[in-house]
Every structure is written in structure tokens, then in C-alpha cells.
Amino acid sequence: MITRRNALAAGAAATVAPALARPALAQGAARNVLRVVPHANLTVLDPIWTTAYITRNGAFMVWDTLFGLDSQFRPQPQMAEGHTLSQDGKLYTITLRPGLRFHDGEPVRSQDCVASIKRWAARDAIGQKLATVVDEYRVLDDRRFEIRLKEPFALTLFALGKPASNVCFIMPERVANTDPNAQIKPEDVIGSGPFRFKRDEWNPGALAVWTRDPAYQPRAEPADWVSGGKRANFERIEWRIIPDAATAAAALQSGEVDWWETPLADLFPLLKRDRNIVLEQMNPLGEIGILRFNQLHPPFDNPEIRRALASAMNQADYMQAIVGDDSSLWKNAGFFTPGTPMASDVGLDALKGPRDLEAAKRALAAAGYKNEKVVLIAATDIPLTHAQSQVTAELLRRLGMNLDYVATDWGTVVQRRASREPVERGGWNLFHTWWAGFDHANPAAHLSIRGNGTGPGSWFGWPTSPRLEELRDAWFIAPSEAAQAKICEEMQVVALRDLPYVPTGQFFIPFAFRRNVTGILKGPMPLFWNVTKS
């Protein structure tokens, strides 16, 4: 019997020989270039306008942050030389490291930092919370500025240094003054990070290139997550966009590329047999799959219809579609990342119990589903989203819903999901994505559990749940971790009722890279500093 897995593996093996025949770079030049197959096509460059990880990952090479989280989730100085905090906890004074410069040669100033924080805070989940307690920003001089708060906010430095989208990247003031709801121009991708973006070589759908900034001065501390010294060991970082998994596997086997960010689980056995390839899991919190509803338009503006669909969804189906039959590569998940202090099983029988399709059909009818079209926008160029979308599409058909399956690429999904129009005017009803486990570890950075509707900084889908917002606010001022965990239990119960999204499970995808590539850092995403190649 020819299974999907066998067919893909055979296809990858068949394409190895042609890949080997292509000309190779000279050894010296090859050592200075890191060639990566990223998880998606890079179509959007503004990491404040979008939460897309592909944009965030590239942005970390270009822009830097005032603080960076280490592997213990502690904020460490990055662009900041240090900070002071007043005794009442309401005045932060941040001092920049001397000599920081943007890639255009201009110095990094306090004015750049203040403008960047303001733009970021308009879009980011925890940034929005910080903005509500900020009294004023005050520039003292080019290297020092103050953040004066109305009340203490213990997560201030965490917010400025977290790697979760949206990241508080520091941009030149003129760029940071861009409307938060508009994208910056490609020519304004200018940061102070270890690499410069090569706009003239950017070919969406094929190639994105960054080159080492010779003027960048890394911190002295060892690199740890997104903190410490960001040492650029390559003259060029090349992202090769290869949507076809078999072709990507063949390129890795032949040495045409050095690193494949999200190898297809069906091809793990093939890759493991190659002694020149290493598969290694670098993200201990894994990833969380989700199905996102558009709650502005029928049919999923109706919570009963959302609940009817969720009652038929089986996390095992989604996880096996992503990682195959190896049960060690996935776990059932609720609304907070399994294994973290805020996670619990409260209410999760609604997601884990037996699935009854006939009961779900009856629930849809009782909820008033009138055969409205359901537009599922599916990114087929990313296996993680494609697999989930296929499971949902089959489920919708079995439930008798009027499915319009729009197979497209991730770049198009990123653009289309921003539309608030009804489906007849180019809108959408459903899409799948995933979040790094870190991003769902607590309410602070958890953008998809927000219930702020179409308010400032709301995320695509625009669910409205006043109770979720009340509980989130309470979490920030809770007196202890135990009290916070209790709040998260209630948040999970409310989320199961209101369903801002449906979690499809927690999964673990290793990086696949050539054995001569070393120094890849553990973290919630691929980090391109500290890496070397022999």
C-alpha cells in the first residue's frame, strides 16, 4: 500500500541525485554562507504590523531589543547598558550602551527607543497593557530615557525583552513614527542588529538574504536565548524558499542547504538514516496548533456554532497529521502551554472527550446554521498549517457545512486574514496557524486568548469576551503565582465557552541540519547568531 508518508519519502530519495549534480560553492566561500530553508515564504517585513513568525525571525537579525530574555525567562540588558528603578517601582531610567549605530550609520538615540516602544505598544498584547499604566516617556539625553508609570508594573522589562510576537524592536525614530496599523517600507528595514537585510536580493517566493554588519559590537556575555552576545559568524545568511518537502529534504541531503527549520515528520526516518544530518529538538515548550475563527461574520459570530464545531474536533487527528504516529512528539493542550505553571486540565474534557459527529450535526442545526459558506484559507506551502487545514476541511465536509477551501500560500494568508470584510468581499471564516509554546505560557504574551474585539491591537478573528479581558487584567495584579494559576483556570473555562480559537494540540518539531553546522542555540525560534560551519 502506498501511503502519503511512503510517497513523500520516495520522492525525496528520488530527487537527491539531481540535487547532487548542481555546482557547489568553493569550500572557503561555503563556510561563510549559511543556507537555510525557513518554515515559510517571507512576504511581510514589518514585525510590528504582523505577528507572523517568519517576519519576526528575520527581524531578529536586523533589529535589536533593549532587553532580551534568557533561557530562565529573565530579562537581561541587550541594547541597554543597564537600568535603575525608583523605590516606589514607578520610574524606570534606561541607559543605552555607548556606540550603538543603525545600519545607515546613524547613532541609536533615546528618541528612537521611545518612538519604537510607542509603536510596538499599540500592537502587542502585553505592550497594550503596559501602555495603560505609562504616565510619560521622557528623553533625558541621547543615551538615557525614562518610563514613568502611574502604578508599578513588574513585567515592564519582560515586555521590552520577550521574543514573542510582537517583539519590541528598536527602529530609527523616523521609521518608528509609521502608523502602527500600516506597514513600514522595504527601504526602511534598517536596524542595529548583527545582520543587514539585502533588499536588492529579496525575491519573495525564492530568496531572502542578510549580510553581516561589520560595525556590530556584540555583548560580552555568552548567548542565551535572545540575550547575551549575538556573534555573527557568517558573511551571508540565505533563506532558500522551498515549499516542497521532498525537494527540501534532497537539498539538505546533498549539502545544497545547511539547515531545514521545519522538516516534515513523514521524512524523519529518511533523514535519520543519513549520517551527515542531525535532527535535534531545540524548543522545550514546543508549538501549539490553533484553529482561528472570524467572529465578525456568520456563521462563527454565533458561539453555539463555534462550540458545535469544536465538539467534533479531535486533537489526536491534528497531531498525527503533523507529526505522524510517534506519540512522544505531541500532547493534548488546553489554552495554556502544557508543562508550564499556568496550565491545567480544568474543563478540558470538552476537548478531550469522545467525539460524536452526529451530535455535532444536531448541535449545528439547533444553533441555526443555515448552510452559510465557510471560507477556510489554508497555507499549503507550510506542512504545519497544511496538515491541520486538511483535517478541518474533511471534518467540515462530514458535518455537512458549506466549505470553500482556499488553498494558497502563507504570505497570502497573512495578508488576507487582516481583512474584516465578509467572505463575498474577500474575507474569510477560518484559518490554521501555530504559536510557540512560550507565547501561550501565560496571559501576558498570549495574543490569541484576548477578547478585545476590534479594539486597538486586536488580533485577526476579533473575538469579543469581556470576561476574558477582566480575568487577564486581574492576572497582572494577582499577588502570587498560585493566585495567577487560579485565574488561568477560570480563563480556560471562559475560553472553552466563548472559544476565541480551538487549540489543536502541542507538538515538537526538531530542526534538521548538516552535521558540520554547530552552535545552534536552544530557544523558541531559529536564531542565526552563534552558529558556525566547518
Where are these regions (language model features)?
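N-terminal lobe/hinge region of extracytoplasmic solute-binding protein
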Residues: 37-87, 118, 190
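Surface-exposed binding/hinge segments that line
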Residues: 95, 129-203
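Structural transition elements
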Residues: 195, 329-366, 380-387
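Ligand/substrate-recognition segments at binding pockets and active sites
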Residues: 206, 244-247, 263-265, 329, ...
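Ligand-site clamp/hinge motif
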Residues: 218-270, 402
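Periplasmic-binding protein-like
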Residues: 270, 296, 300-340, 387-388, ...
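Extracytoplasmic/peripheral linker and loop segments enriched in polar/acidic and small residues
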Residues: 353-354, 404-419, 444-515
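Long beta-strand-rich cores associated with HINT superfamily self-processing modules
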Residues: 513-534
